[in-house]
Amino acid sequence: MAKKIVGFIKLQVPAGKANPSPPIGPALGQRGLNIMEFCKAFNAKTQGMELGLPIPVVITAFADKSFTFIMKTPPATVLIKKASGVQKGSAKPHTDKVGTLTRAQAEEIAKTKQPDLTAADLDAAVRTIAGSARSMGITVEGG
């Protein structure tokens, strides 16, 4: 018989930097889950990734105080800012442009994000990433 699910916890945790301090500690503590067990498992899974890159994670809490977690790909905005060398997006995205993103960079981000996007193919995923970049005030070259 399957375990009874008590709830889901959605967090964004920096890769390799999970520790019991907020927001992780209180979120897991409310459900009675072992905080250090999650931190060790998460840090081990994110070992090969860039340190500090925010990783969305969905933790499934079970009635017997056990848990499983699924890691998603980093947010598109973070990847776009990193690729274009921008600290933050524009306050007026359609009038003030803050950076540029090439088609090749957009394709690279789309390949990274492909598992989490609903796009049918790579070209549709690139258009999704390009749209996100434009809404941040970043010009997309060649697309």
UniProtKB/Swiss-Prot annotation:
One of its GO terms (molecular function) is large ribosomal subunit rRNA binding. GO terms for biological process: translation. It comes from the Bacteria. Keywords: Methylation, Ribonucleoprotein, Ribosomal protein, RNA-binding, rRNA-binding. SMART domains: RL11. The keyword Ligase does not apply. PROSITE patterns: RIBOSOMAL_L11. InterPro entries: Ribosomal_uL11, Ribosomal_uL11_bac-typ, Ribosomal_uL11_C, Ribosomal_uL11_C_sf, Ribosomal_uL11_CS, Ribosomal_uL11_N, Ribosomal_uL11_N_sf. One or more lysine residues are methylated. GO terms for cellular component: cytosolic large ribosomal subunit. The keyword DNA-binding does not apply. It holds the Pfam family Ribosomal_L11_N. Disulfide bonds: none annotated. Forms part of the ribosomal stalk which helps the ribosome interact with GTP-bound translation factors. Part of the ribosomal stalk of the 50S ribosomal subunit. Interacts with L10 and the large rRNA to form the base of the stalk. L10 forms an elongated spine to which L12 dimers bind in a sequential fashion forming a multimeric L10(L12)X complex. Belongs to the universal ribosomal protein uL11 family. This is Large ribosomal subunit protein uL11.
